[in-house]
Protein backbone atom coordinates (compact mmCIF):
# COMPACT_ATOMS: atom_id res chain seq x y z
CA UNK A 1 0.00 0.00 0.00
CA UNK A 2 2.85 2.40 0.80
CA UNK A 3 4.28 1.83 -2.68
CA UNK A 4 0.93 2.76 -4.21
CA UNK A 5 0.83 5.97 -2.21
CA UNK A 6 4.35 6.81 -3.32
CA UNK A 7 3.46 6.10 -6.94
CA UNK A 8 0.43 8.38 -6.73
CA UNK A 9 2.56 11.05 -5.08
CA UNK A 10 5.15 10.98 -7.86
CA UNK A 11 2.42 11.00 -10.51
CA UNK A 12 0.99 14.07 -8.80
CA UNK A 13 4.38 15.77 -8.81
CA UNK A 14 4.91 14.88 -12.46
CA UNK A 15 1.51 16.25 -13.48
CA UNK A 16 2.20 19.44 -11.57
CA UNK A 17 5.50 19.81 -13.38
CA UNK A 18 3.95 19.19 -16.78
CA UNK A 19 1.23 21.76 -16.10
CA UNK A 20 3.69 24.37 -14.89
CA UNK A 21 3.99 25.85 -18.38
CA UNK A 22 0.86 25.15 -20.39
CA UNK A 23 2.34 26.82 -23.47
CA UNK A 24 5.25 24.37 -23.81
CA UNK A 25 5.65 23.36 -27.44
CA UNK A 26 3.90 26.46 -28.78
CA UNK A 27 6.53 28.58 -30.56
CA UNK A 28 6.61 32.35 -30.19
CA UNK A 29 5.32 33.57 -33.58
CA UNK A 30 7.29 36.83 -33.67
CA UNK A 31 10.82 37.00 -35.06
CA UNK A 32 13.34 37.96 -32.35
CA UNK A 33 15.87 39.14 -34.96
CA UNK A 34 19.11 37.81 -36.41
CA UNK A 35 21.27 36.09 -33.83
CA UNK A 36 18.53 36.34 -31.21
CA UNK A 37 16.18 33.93 -29.48
CA UNK A 38 13.33 34.25 -26.99
CA UNK A 39 13.82 34.10 -23.22
CA UNK A 40 10.83 33.61 -20.92
CA UNK A 41 10.16 36.36 -18.36
CA UNK A 42 8.87 34.22 -15.51
CA UNK A 43 7.95 37.10 -13.20
CA UNK A 44 5.12 38.16 -15.55
CA UNK A 45 4.20 34.75 -17.00
CA UNK A 46 1.64 32.44 -15.42
CA UNK A 47 -0.20 29.18 -16.16
CA UNK A 48 -2.68 29.90 -13.31
CA UNK A 49 -2.45 26.27 -12.19
CA UNK A 50 -3.36 27.07 -8.59
CA UNK A 51 -6.47 27.99 -6.63
CA UNK A 52 -6.87 31.63 -5.65
CA UNK A 53 -9.72 33.74 -4.32
CA UNK A 54 -10.10 36.92 -2.30
CA UNK A 55 -8.85 36.20 1.21
CA UNK A 56 -6.99 33.12 -0.01
CA UNK A 57 -4.27 34.32 -2.36
CA UNK A 58 -1.25 31.99 -2.59
CA UNK A 59 2.27 33.26 -3.17
CA UNK A 60 2.02 32.02 -6.77
CA UNK A 61 -0.52 34.81 -7.28
CA UNK A 62 0.67 37.55 -4.93
CA UNK A 63 4.27 37.39 -6.15
CA UNK A 64 3.13 38.45 -9.63
CA UNK A 65 -0.32 40.06 -9.45
CA UNK A 66 -2.64 42.29 -7.49
CA UNK A 67 -6.45 42.13 -8.01
CA UNK A 68 -6.85 45.86 -8.59
CA UNK A 69 -5.99 48.72 -10.95
CA UNK A 70 -2.60 50.47 -10.92
CA UNK A 71 -4.09 53.22 -8.74
CA UNK A 72 -7.39 53.93 -6.96
CA UNK A 73 -9.50 54.36 -10.11
CA UNK A 74 -12.55 52.06 -10.05
CA UNK A 75 -13.11 51.79 -13.81
CA UNK A 76 -14.97 53.40 -16.71
CA UNK A 77 -18.72 53.84 -17.13
CA UNK A 78 -20.70 51.56 -14.82
CA UNK A 79 -17.62 49.50 -13.88
CA UNK A 80 -16.61 48.86 -10.28
CA UNK A 81 -13.27 47.05 -10.19
CA UNK A 82 -13.56 44.53 -7.37
CA UNK A 83 -11.01 41.98 -6.12
CA UNK A 84 -13.38 39.00 -5.52
CA UNK A 85 -14.24 38.91 -9.23
CA UNK A 86 -10.66 37.84 -10.08
CA UNK A 87 -9.98 34.23 -9.11
CA UNK A 88 -8.37 31.01 -10.31
CA UNK A 89 -9.80 27.49 -10.29
CA UNK A 90 -6.61 25.44 -10.43
CA UNK A 91 -6.11 25.68 -14.17
CA UNK A 92 -7.38 29.07 -15.39
CA UNK A 93 -7.83 32.69 -14.38
CA UNK A 94 -11.42 33.91 -14.19
CA UNK A 95 -12.14 37.60 -14.76
CA UNK A 96 -15.80 37.81 -13.83
CA UNK A 97 -18.54 40.45 -14.03
CA UNK A 98 -21.40 40.33 -11.51
CA UNK A 99 -24.35 42.61 -10.66
CA UNK A 100 -23.68 45.44 -8.22
CA UNK A 101 -27.14 47.04 -8.32
CA UNK A 102 -28.16 50.45 -9.61
CA UNK A 103 -27.17 49.45 -13.13
CA UNK A 104 -23.53 48.92 -12.15
CA UNK A 105 -21.32 45.84 -12.19
CA UNK A 106 -18.51 44.39 -10.11
CA UNK A 107 -15.65 43.63 -12.50
CA UNK A 108 -12.56 41.48 -12.08
CA UNK A 109 -9.09 42.82 -12.77
CA UNK A 110 -5.47 41.84 -12.20
CA UNK A 111 -2.39 44.05 -12.60
CA UNK A 112 1.19 42.82 -12.78
CA UNK A 113 3.48 43.76 -9.92
CA UNK A 114 6.47 43.69 -12.27
CA UNK A 115 6.85 45.93 -15.29
CA UNK A 116 7.80 45.09 -18.85
CA UNK A 117 9.41 47.20 -21.55
CA UNK A 118 10.30 46.83 -25.20
CA UNK A 119 11.57 44.71 -26.85
CA UNK A 120 9.04 42.23 -25.47
CA UNK A 121 6.50 39.71 -26.75
CA UNK A 122 3.36 39.13 -24.64
CA UNK A 123 0.56 36.67 -25.28
CA UNK A 124 -2.47 35.13 -23.60
CA UNK A 125 -4.70 32.20 -24.43
CA UNK A 126 -8.24 33.26 -23.55
CA UNK A 127 -11.97 32.95 -24.21
CA UNK A 128 -14.02 36.12 -23.91
CA UNK A 129 -17.38 36.21 -22.16
CA UNK A 130 -20.80 36.31 -23.87
CA UNK A 131 -21.57 39.86 -22.72
CA UNK A 132 -21.60 43.39 -24.10
CA UNK A 133 -18.75 44.17 -21.70
CA UNK A 134 -15.17 44.72 -22.84
CA UNK A 135 -12.68 41.91 -22.19
CA UNK A 136 -9.14 43.24 -22.36
CA UNK A 137 -5.45 42.33 -22.18
CA UNK A 138 -3.47 45.57 -22.13
CA UNK A 139 -0.56 47.54 -20.70
CA UNK A 140 -0.43 50.97 -19.06
CA UNK A 141 2.32 53.22 -17.72
CA UNK A 142 2.27 54.64 -14.19
CA UNK A 143 1.51 58.14 -15.49
CA UNK A 144 -1.32 56.74 -17.65
CA UNK A 145 -0.02 58.37 -20.83
CA UNK A 146 0.95 55.24 -22.80
CA UNK A 147 -1.39 52.28 -23.36
CA UNK A 148 -1.11 49.20 -25.57
CA UNK A 149 -4.28 47.16 -26.14
CA UNK A 150 -3.08 43.70 -27.15
CA UNK A 151 -6.74 42.71 -27.42
CA UNK A 152 -10.09 44.22 -26.47
CA UNK A 153 -13.11 42.10 -27.34
CA UNK A 154 -16.86 42.34 -26.93
CA UNK A 155 -18.48 38.92 -26.73
CA UNK A 156 -22.01 39.97 -27.64
CA UNK A 157 -23.47 42.90 -29.48
CA UNK A 158 -27.05 43.74 -28.62
CA UNK A 159 -28.85 44.60 -31.86
CA UNK A 160 -26.12 43.31 -34.17
CA UNK A 161 -23.00 41.20 -34.65
CA UNK A 162 -20.41 43.75 -35.75
CA UNK A 163 -18.47 44.01 -32.47
CA UNK A 164 -18.85 40.32 -31.60
CA UNK A 165 -17.10 39.37 -34.84
CA UNK A 166 -14.20 41.81 -34.49
CA UNK A 167 -11.25 42.10 -32.15
CA UNK A 168 -9.91 45.56 -31.30
CA UNK A 169 -6.10 45.83 -31.69
CA UNK A 170 -4.99 49.32 -30.78
CA UNK A 171 -3.06 51.66 -28.51
CA UNK A 172 -3.49 55.11 -26.92
CA UNK A 173 -1.32 58.11 -26.18
CA UNK A 174 -2.70 60.59 -23.66
CA UNK A 175 -2.23 64.07 -22.32
CA UNK A 176 -3.78 64.03 -18.87
CA UNK A 177 -4.23 67.76 -18.29
CA UNK A 178 -6.19 68.87 -20.20
CA UNK A 179 -7.32 65.34 -21.03
CA UNK A 180 -6.55 64.46 -24.66
CA UNK A 181 -6.69 60.96 -26.13
CA UNK A 182 -5.25 59.65 -29.39
CA UNK A 183 -5.73 56.17 -30.81
CA UNK A 184 -5.53 54.99 -34.41
CA UNK A 185 -8.89 54.67 -36.13
CA UNK A 186 -10.31 52.72 -39.06
CA UNK A 187 -11.07 49.14 -40.03
CA UNK A 188 -7.43 48.07 -39.61
CA UNK A 189 -7.82 48.39 -35.83
CA UNK A 190 -10.75 45.91 -35.83
CA UNK A 191 -9.66 42.42 -36.90
CA UNK A 192 -12.49 40.46 -38.55
CA UNK A 193 -12.72 36.73 -37.88
CA UNK A 194 -14.68 35.68 -40.96
CA UNK A 195 -18.04 36.07 -39.26
CA UNK A 196 -17.39 33.79 -36.26
CA UNK A 197 -17.95 35.48 -32.87
CA UNK A 198 -14.75 35.60 -30.84
CA UNK A 199 -16.61 34.29 -27.78
CA UNK A 200 -17.06 30.87 -29.40
CA UNK A 201 -13.55 29.56 -28.72
CA UNK A 202 -10.22 30.08 -27.01
CA UNK A 203 -7.72 32.11 -29.02
CA UNK A 204 -4.13 33.26 -28.57
CA UNK A 205 -3.72 37.03 -28.58
CA UNK A 206 -0.19 38.41 -28.73
CA UNK A 207 1.77 41.57 -29.39
CA UNK A 208 5.46 42.13 -30.08
CA UNK A 209 6.33 45.57 -28.70
CA UNK A 210 9.45 45.73 -30.79
CA UNK A 211 10.56 49.30 -30.07
CA UNK A 212 8.90 52.65 -29.18
CA UNK A 213 7.53 52.98 -32.71
CA UNK A 214 6.64 49.40 -33.73
CA UNK A 215 3.85 47.08 -32.59
CA UNK A 216 3.14 43.70 -34.18
CA UNK A 217 -0.18 42.01 -33.34
CA UNK A 218 -0.67 38.23 -33.52
CA UNK A 219 -3.80 36.09 -33.24
CA UNK A 220 -3.47 32.31 -33.03
CA UNK A 221 0.17 32.60 -34.10
CA UNK A 222 -0.51 34.69 -37.21
CA UNK A 223 0.62 38.29 -37.61
CA UNK A 224 -2.56 40.26 -38.34
CA UNK A 225 -1.52 43.89 -37.86
CA UNK A 226 1.63 46.02 -37.73
CA UNK A 227 1.69 49.58 -36.39
CA UNK A 228 4.67 51.78 -37.29
CA UNK A 229 5.95 55.26 -36.47
CA UNK A 230 3.37 57.21 -38.49
CA UNK A 231 0.52 55.79 -36.38
CA UNK A 232 2.15 55.65 -32.95
CA UNK A 233 1.84 59.27 -31.82
CA UNK A 234 1.08 61.62 -34.76
CA UNK A 235 -0.26 64.33 -32.42
CA UNK A 236 3.01 64.35 -30.43
CA UNK A 237 1.36 63.75 -27.07
CA UNK A 238 4.57 62.05 -25.90
CA UNK A 239 7.05 64.62 -27.17
CA UNK A 240 8.58 62.35 -29.77
CA UNK A 241 9.53 59.49 -27.44
CA UNK A 242 7.00 56.98 -28.75
CA UNK A 243 5.85 54.14 -26.51
CA UNK A 244 9.03 54.06 -24.47
CA UNK A 245 8.11 53.68 -20.80
CA UNK A 246 8.11 50.56 -18.66
CA UNK A 247 4.55 49.43 -18.15
CA UNK A 248 2.28 47.15 -16.13
CA UNK A 249 0.21 44.34 -17.63
CA UNK A 250 -3.55 44.43 -16.98
CA UNK A 251 -6.21 41.78 -17.63
CA UNK A 252 -9.77 42.91 -16.91
CA UNK A 253 -13.37 43.30 -18.01
CA UNK A 254 -15.18 46.65 -18.17
CA UNK A 255 -18.77 47.90 -18.35
CA UNK A 256 -18.03 50.74 -20.77
CA UNK A 257 -21.40 52.47 -20.63
CA UNK A 258 -19.82 55.79 -21.60
CA UNK A 259 -20.05 54.54 -25.20
CA UNK A 260 -21.43 50.97 -25.10
CA UNK A 261 -24.81 49.55 -24.04
CA UNK A 262 -24.97 48.49 -20.41
CA UNK A 263 -25.20 44.87 -19.38
CA UNK A 264 -28.43 44.13 -17.56
CA UNK A 265 -28.37 42.86 -14.00
CA UNK A 266 -29.90 39.60 -15.25
CA UNK A 267 -27.12 39.16 -17.83
CA UNK A 268 -24.49 39.86 -15.21
CA UNK A 269 -25.97 37.21 -12.90
CA UNK A 270 -25.60 34.44 -15.51
CA UNK A 271 -22.43 32.59 -14.50
CA UNK A 272 -22.40 30.72 -17.82
CA UNK A 273 -21.86 34.00 -19.66
CA UNK A 274 -20.12 36.40 -17.28
CA UNK A 275 -16.54 35.04 -17.13
CA UNK A 276 -13.53 36.02 -19.25
CA UNK A 277 -11.39 32.86 -19.05
CA UNK A 278 -7.60 33.11 -19.35
CA UNK A 279 -5.72 29.83 -19.68
CA UNK A 280 -2.24 31.35 -19.50
CA UNK A 281 -0.10 34.41 -20.09
CA UNK A 282 3.49 34.28 -21.31
CA UNK A 283 6.03 37.06 -21.84
CA UNK A 284 9.39 36.81 -23.62
CA UNK A 285 12.32 39.07 -24.37
CA UNK A 286 14.78 38.59 -27.26
CA UNK A 287 18.31 37.71 -26.17
CA UNK A 288 21.45 36.84 -28.10
CA UNK A 289 21.61 33.22 -29.25
CA UNK A 290 24.89 32.88 -27.37
CA UNK A 291 22.85 33.82 -24.33
CA UNK A 292 20.94 30.59 -24.71
CA UNK A 293 17.50 32.16 -24.46
CA UNK A 294 15.53 29.29 -23.07
CA UNK A 295 12.14 29.99 -24.68
CA UNK A 296 10.61 28.65 -21.50
CA UNK A 297 12.93 25.62 -21.27
CA UNK A 298 16.05 24.89 -19.21
CA UNK A 299 19.53 24.93 -20.70
CA UNK A 300 20.56 28.57 -21.09
CA UNK A 301 24.34 28.95 -20.80
CA UNK A 302 24.79 32.73 -21.02
CA UNK A 303 22.93 35.67 -19.51
CA UNK A 304 23.68 39.32 -20.31
CA UNK A 305 22.15 42.13 -18.24
CA UNK A 306 22.37 45.88 -18.73
CA UNK A 307 21.65 47.54 -15.39
CA UNK A 308 19.88 50.89 -15.37
CA UNK A 309 16.49 52.54 -15.03
CA UNK A 310 13.11 51.37 -16.28
CA UNK A 311 13.48 53.59 -19.35
CA UNK A 312 17.20 53.99 -20.09
CA UNK A 313 18.82 52.60 -23.24
CA UNK A 314 19.73 48.90 -23.34
CA UNK A 315 22.79 47.49 -25.10
CA UNK A 316 21.78 45.27 -28.08
CA UNK A 317 21.36 41.63 -27.09
CA UNK A 318 21.20 42.44 -23.38
CA UNK A 319 18.22 42.23 -21.03
CA UNK A 320 17.27 45.20 -18.86
CA UNK A 321 17.65 45.01 -15.09
CA UNK A 322 16.38 48.01 -13.15
CA UNK A 323 16.19 48.70 -9.43
CA UNK A 324 12.64 47.26 -9.51
CA UNK A 325 13.51 43.96 -11.23
CA UNK A 326 12.50 41.37 -8.65
CA UNK A 327 13.89 37.88 -8.68
CA UNK A 328 11.88 35.45 -10.77
CA UNK A 329 14.21 33.59 -13.08
CA UNK A 330 16.57 36.50 -12.43
CA UNK A 331 16.66 39.78 -10.55
CA UNK A 332 17.11 41.38 -7.13
CA UNK A 333 15.99 39.31 -4.16
CA UNK A 334 15.20 42.55 -2.30
CA UNK A 335 14.64 45.77 -4.24
CA UNK A 336 14.39 48.02 -1.17
CA UNK A 337 17.03 50.77 -1.10
CA UNK A 338 18.36 49.96 -4.57
CA UNK A 339 18.58 53.06 -6.75
CA UNK A 340 19.02 53.55 -10.48
CA UNK A 341 20.30 56.43 -12.59
CA UNK A 342 20.76 57.23 -16.26
CA UNK A 343 23.81 59.53 -16.48
CA UNK A 344 23.44 60.07 -20.23
CA UNK A 345 25.84 59.51 -23.09
CA UNK A 346 28.19 62.46 -22.57
CA UNK A 347 31.96 62.03 -22.19
CA UNK A 348 31.93 58.97 -24.43
CA UNK A 349 29.81 56.74 -22.19
CA UNK A 350 28.14 53.97 -24.16
CA UNK A 351 24.74 52.41 -23.44
CA UNK A 352 26.27 49.86 -21.08
CA UNK A 353 27.93 52.40 -18.80
CA UNK A 354 25.57 55.38 -18.98
CA UNK A 355 23.12 53.81 -16.51
CA UNK A 356 23.57 52.01 -13.20
CA UNK A 357 22.02 50.22 -10.25
CA UNK A 358 23.48 51.17 -6.86
CA UNK A 359 22.93 50.82 -3.12
CA UNK A 360 24.59 51.38 0.22
CA UNK A 361 23.01 48.15 1.46
CA UNK A 362 24.02 44.54 0.90
CA UNK A 363 21.81 43.11 -1.84
CA UNK A 364 21.57 39.78 -3.67
CA UNK A 365 21.13 39.27 -7.41
CA UNK A 366 19.97 35.76 -8.33
CA UNK A 367 19.92 33.82 -11.61
CA UNK A 368 18.27 30.45 -12.21
CA UNK A 369 20.54 28.21 -14.31
CA UNK A 370 21.75 24.66 -14.73
CA UNK A 371 24.49 23.41 -12.44
CA UNK A 372 28.09 23.85 -13.51
CA UNK A 373 30.97 26.31 -13.53
CA UNK A 374 30.23 29.86 -14.66
CA UNK A 375 32.34 32.89 -15.44
CA UNK A 376 30.78 36.08 -14.10
CA UNK A 377 31.84 39.48 -15.44
CA UNK A 378 30.71 42.62 -13.62
CA UNK A 379 31.31 46.21 -14.72
CA UNK A 380 31.69 48.74 -11.90
CA UNK A 381 31.67 52.54 -12.08
CA UNK A 382 29.75 55.80 -12.13
CA UNK A 383 30.24 59.47 -12.81
CA UNK A 384 31.21 59.67 -9.13
CA UNK A 385 34.17 57.94 -7.48
CA UNK A 386 33.28 54.69 -5.72
CA UNK A 387 35.32 52.83 -3.10
CA UNK A 388 35.63 49.38 -1.59
CA UNK A 389 32.95 47.57 -3.59
CA UNK A 390 32.74 43.83 -2.95
CA UNK A 391 31.10 40.83 -4.61
CA UNK A 392 30.55 37.33 -3.24
CA UNK A 393 29.14 34.38 -5.18
CA UNK A 394 27.58 31.28 -3.66
CA UNK A 395 28.75 32.51 -0.25
CA UNK A 396 32.41 32.93 -1.27
CA UNK A 397 34.17 36.29 -1.55
CA UNK A 398 35.21 36.77 -5.17
CA UNK A 399 35.96 40.48 -5.68
CA UNK A 400 37.04 42.83 -2.89
CA UNK A 401 38.04 46.46 -2.56
CA UNK A 402 37.06 47.46 -6.11
CA UNK A 403 37.64 51.20 -6.53
CA UNK A 404 36.75 53.45 -9.47
CA UNK A 405 37.48 57.09 -10.10
CA UNK A 406 34.78 59.48 -11.29
CA UNK A 407 33.87 58.53 -14.86
CA UNK A 408 35.92 55.32 -14.72
CA UNK A 409 34.40 51.92 -15.54
CA UNK A 410 36.21 48.73 -14.59
CA UNK A 411 35.26 45.16 -15.50
CA UNK A 412 36.25 42.26 -13.27
CA UNK A 413 35.39 38.59 -13.61
CA UNK A 414 35.66 35.35 -11.69
CA UNK A 415 34.57 31.72 -11.91
CA UNK A 416 32.10 30.08 -9.57
CA UNK A 417 30.64 26.59 -9.19
CA UNK A 418 26.84 26.32 -8.93
CA UNK A 419 25.27 23.09 -7.66
CA UNK A 420 21.80 24.18 -6.50
CA UNK A 421 20.32 25.53 -9.74
CA UNK A 422 20.62 29.17 -8.67
CA UNK A 423 23.53 31.60 -8.74
CA UNK A 424 23.55 34.05 -5.83
CA UNK A 425 25.64 37.21 -6.21
CA UNK A 426 26.06 39.39 -3.10
CA UNK A 427 26.94 43.07 -3.61
CA UNK A 428 28.20 45.07 -0.64
CA UNK A 429 30.38 47.99 0.42
CA UNK A 430 33.33 47.76 2.81
CA UNK A 431 34.77 50.31 5.21
CA UNK A 432 35.22 53.72 3.62
CA UNK A 433 32.79 53.06 0.79
CA UNK A 434 29.43 54.72 0.31
CA UNK A 435 27.62 52.67 -2.35
CA UNK A 436 28.32 49.88 -4.79
CA UNK A 437 27.56 50.88 -8.37
CA UNK A 438 27.36 48.45 -11.30
CA UNK A 439 26.42 48.74 -14.96
CA UNK A 440 26.57 45.16 -16.23
CA UNK A 441 26.31 41.51 -15.16
CA UNK A 442 27.44 38.92 -17.71
CA UNK A 443 27.17 35.23 -16.76
CA UNK A 444 28.68 32.57 -19.05
CA UNK A 445 28.97 28.83 -18.53
CA UNK A 446 32.56 27.60 -18.69
CA UNK A 447 32.95 24.87 -21.32
CA UNK A 448 35.65 22.24 -21.53
CA UNK A 449 37.05 24.00 -24.61
CA UNK A 450 37.51 27.30 -22.81
CA UNK A 451 39.04 25.61 -19.76
CA UNK A 452 41.50 23.61 -21.87
CA UNK A 453 42.46 26.68 -23.86
CA UNK A 454 43.20 28.67 -20.74
CA UNK A 455 45.37 25.89 -19.38
CA UNK A 456 47.22 25.59 -22.68
CA UNK A 457 48.06 29.29 -22.60
CA UNK A 458 49.52 29.21 -19.10
CA UNK A 459 46.44 30.56 -17.33
CA UNK A 460 44.13 28.89 -14.84
CA UNK A 461 40.50 29.52 -14.07
CA UNK A 462 41.53 31.13 -10.79
CA UNK A 463 43.84 33.76 -12.29
CA UNK A 464 42.79 37.36 -11.53
CA UNK A 465 41.16 38.71 -14.64
CA UNK A 466 41.81 42.37 -13.84
CA UNK A 467 45.35 41.99 -15.14
CA UNK A 468 44.46 39.81 -18.10
CA UNK A 469 41.34 41.16 -19.75
CA UNK A 470 40.37 43.69 -22.39
CA UNK A 471 36.77 44.75 -22.87
CA UNK A 472 35.51 46.00 -26.21
CA UNK A 473 34.04 48.46 -26.89
CA UNK A 474 36.10 50.62 -24.57
CA UNK A 475 33.82 52.65 -22.28
CA UNK A 476 35.06 55.88 -23.86
CA UNK A 477 35.74 54.78 -27.44
CA UNK A 478 33.96 53.00 -30.27
CA UNK A 479 36.85 52.51 -32.72
CA UNK A 480 36.95 49.04 -34.27
CA UNK A 481 40.31 48.06 -32.82
CA UNK A 482 41.89 47.02 -29.56
CA UNK A 483 45.33 48.14 -28.37
CA UNK A 484 47.78 45.64 -26.84
CA UNK A 485 50.22 47.61 -24.66
CA UNK A 486 53.86 46.64 -24.03
CA UNK A 487 54.07 44.68 -27.26
CA UNK A 488 57.54 43.53 -28.33
CA UNK A 489 58.37 44.81 -31.82
CA UNK A 490 59.14 41.94 -34.17
CA UNK A 491 57.10 39.38 -32.25
CA UNK A 492 53.69 38.00 -33.23
CA UNK A 493 50.27 38.32 -31.66
CA UNK A 494 47.94 35.37 -32.21
CA UNK A 495 44.20 35.54 -31.54
CA UNK A 496 42.25 32.35 -30.86
CA UNK A 497 38.49 31.88 -30.64
CA UNK A 498 36.89 30.01 -27.74
CA UNK A 499 37.29 26.71 -29.61
CA UNK A 500 41.06 27.17 -29.79
CA UNK A 501 41.15 28.02 -33.50
CA UNK A 502 43.47 30.74 -34.80
CA UNK A 503 41.38 33.60 -36.19
CA UNK A 504 44.09 36.24 -36.67
CA UNK A 505 47.87 36.62 -36.59
CA UNK A 506 49.49 40.07 -36.37
CA UNK A 507 53.16 41.06 -36.65
CA UNK A 508 54.01 43.61 -33.96
CA UNK A 509 55.31 46.91 -35.36
CA UNK A 510 54.51 49.13 -32.37
CA UNK A 511 54.91 48.92 -28.61
CA UNK A 512 51.20 49.73 -28.41
CA UNK A 513 50.07 47.44 -31.20
CA UNK A 514 46.59 48.06 -32.57
CA UNK A 515 44.55 45.12 -33.83
CA UNK A 516 41.57 45.64 -36.10
CA UNK A 517 38.39 43.90 -34.96
CA UNK A 518 36.68 44.17 -38.32
CA UNK A 519 34.85 40.94 -39.10
CA UNK A 520 35.02 39.62 -35.53
CA UNK A 521 31.76 38.03 -34.41
CA UNK A 522 30.49 38.64 -30.88
CA UNK A 523 32.11 36.38 -28.35
CA UNK A 524 35.19 35.63 -26.28
CA UNK A 525 38.67 35.43 -27.80
CA UNK A 526 42.17 34.92 -26.41
CA UNK A 527 45.18 37.05 -27.35
CA UNK A 528 48.57 35.35 -27.10
CA UNK A 529 51.76 37.42 -27.01
CA UNK A 530 55.07 35.74 -26.22
CA UNK A 531 53.38 32.88 -24.40
CA UNK A 532 51.18 35.16 -22.29
CA UNK A 533 47.42 35.12 -22.91
CA UNK A 534 44.53 37.43 -22.13
CA UNK A 535 40.81 37.41 -22.82
CA UNK A 536 39.28 39.67 -25.45
CA UNK A 537 35.51 40.06 -25.30
CA UNK A 538 33.82 41.42 -28.42
CA UNK A 539 30.22 42.42 -27.95
Swiss-Prot record:
**Active-site feature positions:** 147 (nucleophile), 152 (proton donor)
Its GO CC terms are:
extracellular region
Q: Which Pfam families match?
A: AGA-YXIM_GBD (PF21254), Por_Secre_tail (PF18962)
Q: Which residues form the signal peptide?
A: 1-19
In this chain, substrate is annotated as bound at 73, 82-92, 96-98, 144, 176, 271
Q: Which parts of this chain are annotated as the region Disordered?
A: 332-353
**Do you know which NCBIfam families this protein is assigned to?**
Por_Secre_tail
Subunit structure of this chain's protein = Monomer.
Family as reported in the entry's similarity comment: Belongs to the glycosyl hydrolase 16 family.
Instruction: List the protein's name.
Output: Beta-agarase A
* Lineage of origin: Bacteria, Pseudomonadati, Bacteroidota, Flavobacteriia, Flavobacteriales
Amino acid sequence: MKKNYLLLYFIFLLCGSIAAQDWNGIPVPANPGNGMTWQLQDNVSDSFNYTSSEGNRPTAFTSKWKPSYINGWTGPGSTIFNAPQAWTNGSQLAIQAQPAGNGKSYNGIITSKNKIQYPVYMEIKAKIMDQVLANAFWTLTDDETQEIDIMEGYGSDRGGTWFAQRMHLSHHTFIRNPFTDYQPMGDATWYYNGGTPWRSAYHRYGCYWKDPFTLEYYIDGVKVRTVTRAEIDPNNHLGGTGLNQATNIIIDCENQTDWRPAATQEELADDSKNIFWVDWIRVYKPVAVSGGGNNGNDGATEFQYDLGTDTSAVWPGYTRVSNTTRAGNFGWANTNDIGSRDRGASNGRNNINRDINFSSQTRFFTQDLSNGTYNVLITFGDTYARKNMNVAAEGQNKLTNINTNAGQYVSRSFDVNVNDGKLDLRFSVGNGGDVWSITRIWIRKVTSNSANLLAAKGLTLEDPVETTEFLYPNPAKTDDFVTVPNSEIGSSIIIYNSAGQVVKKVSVVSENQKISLEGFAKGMYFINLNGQSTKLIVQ
